[in-house]
UniProtKB/Swiss-Prot annotation:
Belongs to the DsrB family. This is Protein DsrB. Coiled coil: none annotated. InterPro entries: Dextransucrase_DSRB. It comes from Citrobacter koseri (strain ATCC BAA-895 / CDC 4225-83 / SGSC4696). The lineage of its organism: Bacteria, Pseudomonadati, Pseudomonadota, Gammaproteobacteria, Enterobacterales. Pfam families: DSRB. Signal peptide: none annotated.
Length: 62
């Protein structure tokens, strides 16, 4: 995924929420995405852990 991609994010206890990627930071353990959400327009960071399906919080929408 890259900046300006439309995504959905997994949050605790609710449905996936739509957003837009504002920034991407790569790490050896996975990737951090700064995602703008309706109630967080300046963005909130989410981490996608490499190699663990349960650690995937950001997914690109079609």
């Amino acid at each position: 995924m890259k900046v300006n991609d439309r995504v959905t994010v997994k949050t605790d206890g609710g449905p996936r929420r739509p957003g837009v990627v504002l920034a991407v930071e790569e790490f050896s353990e996975g990737t951090m995405y700064l995602v703008s959400l309706e109630d967080y327009p300046l963005g909130i960071w989410f981490f996608n852990e490499s190699g663990h399906q349960d650690g995937i919080f950001v997914e690109k929408t079609e």
